[in-house]
Amino acid sequence: MSDPRRPLRVMQSFGAPRVTTNPYITMLDEALAATDGIEHVRFSWREALLGRYDVFHWHWPEVKLHGSSAVSSVGKYALTGLLALRHGLSRRIAVVRTVHNLDLPDDNAARLWLLRRIDRQADHRIVLNETTPLPAGTAQTVILHGHYRDWYGVQPRAERLRGRLGTFGGVRRYKGVSGFVDAYADAMARDPEISMIVGGKASSAELAEDLRTRVADLPNVVLELEFLSDAELVQLVTGSELIVLAYRFMHNSGSVLAALSLDRPVLVPRNAPNEALAAEVGPEWVQMYDGEVDADALLEALRAVRAITGDRPDLSRREWDDAGAAHAAAYREALRARLARVRPRGRAVEA
């Protein structure tokens, strides 16, 4: 950054977005491409290992370690190791990492070792909410997860069905869909007018079969255990009166933001991030339960959301133009620290 007039050349760890790419990545890609002072570079192995850039920005580095076969995975591991080596040796490439998840994924010892090495190389971290715990003195910028209003706004909406409880997204055990089904079964005994829809690809055939077995004798249940297109997702969410996300652990949830962006209230576990979200967007839009989701939580949340008088939650702090500018500021801070060979400590940089 010897010439302050030159745009920062920033390489992301993601390539060109595809149809199945996480919308967060696609919208970030668009926001960065439109941000002044940034030359936005998508990932390629050749450019990452041999090209010139000022900043490298990691998202989910574990994705780079897995190929389509065992041989491919070994090759990906070696390439990622070389990339980490380049970043570790360079005095002129800053490393930024977005903290999407708090914990490392379940993986083998070699991959976990490399992921920890990558994490230690970060000159600056971006966190998506104000409650993400990081070690004292970690240089960080809070950039709230952007909304999906523009992304889903082009899709036609469904008519909201009274009593319809919906959940969507990749169906994994930690997302608590089985517990939601059991709570729905108990709630049905008290209010036979409610209904339920589950949409999203199951992570395993065993989980899909377990859910089919659980709902086999339940009325008013729709299971769509396949990947949802944007149009299908919008139909599911807007056709529901309440979106239930009964995760066993929740920190940064794109599904919560998707539902709120489509003006549907959510029921989520009570924790610090969700309490902060409720205070931000309006508590009536973010219903919470303690412990495990149960029939009481479902029925009480339905009663509460029927009292909502506003048309939509307040997502004004989650504009993508603001996110692009905040990323640019974080990149400049990280590069200043790297060029000075001093990691910034003891202060956070506000977006």
Show where each model-derived region lies.
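A charged, aromatic-enriched C-terminal amphipathic alpha-helix characteristic of glycosyltransferases
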Residues: V293-A297, R306-R345
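Acidic donor-binding loop of glycosyltransferase active sites
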Residues: Q235-H251, R264
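Short acidic alpha-helix that forms the nucleotide-activated donor recognition element
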Residues: L228-S240, L257, S261
